[in-house]
């Protein structure tokens, strides 16, 4: 269900020739048909969320094709022209290097980088936002970047919730409870849901849910009897908050609305939204 202000609406793309129009329409249809409530104050916030999701998906595919390597934190490496490898295996932005240039270099020179899946997901989030922000804004918000597991800049606002419906552009986690301790890095896999039943995970590539579970199961202890599984934990960029920084030069998606109800009362507690 999509709510704009106090109106429950069914949105649709009005310009079928705009970039990724079919993908955007699919996302809107999924959101409108889900039981989960997606609440926005304005249509511009919805447009930002839609474009953010598309950019997360395209950034995930770009990272997959960049040559970016999978390594444990003990074996991680980065381009020393832009980053310093920390003692724990993270990547610390060098002084006087614009974050926008350093993030873009990961996608341009992926073979010069290697790390684990959690860091890869954060890199994808930064790249998606860079596509929607002015470079000056991005550099101001995300100065002094550190790329390491789930350590991310405090100005990157994320929402993690349990339960809810899966939408393309969501970050979801596969858990492998009986992982072989010799390959503990395969205790789980952070992935971006690409839509059409495919996920991208750094280390496993672009695969279906069943294929990722199979890959994780291959890395269990001998005689394991518990299968890996897709958890119900979903992580998203808080598009409502992050939309404040969007570039005015970013083209807006043209969205029309079929009104369903215009007297909804929306209440949000934590990450749960209810409509009365």
Swiss-Prot record:
GO biological process: sporulation resulting in formation of a cellular spore
Swiss-Prot/TrEMBL catalytic activity: L-glutaminyl-[protein] + L-lysyl-[protein] = [protein]-L-lysyl-N(6)-5-L-glutamyl-[protein] + NH4(+)
Superkingdom per UniProt: Bacteria
Protein name: Protein-glutamine gamma-glutamyltransferase
Top-level taxonomy: Bacteria, Bacillati, Bacillota, Bacilli, Bacillales
InterPro entries for this protein: Gln_gamma-glutamylTfrase_bac
One Pfam family from the record: TGL
Gene Ontology molecular function, alphabetical: protein-glutamine gamma-glutamyltransferase activity
Family, as annotated: Belongs to the bacillus TGase family.
Keyword Acyltransferase: yes
UniProt EC number: 2.3.2.13
Function description: Probably plays a role in the assembly of the spore coat proteins by catalyzing epsilon-(gamma-glutamyl)lysine cross-links.
Key words of the record: Acyltransferase, Sporulation, Transferase
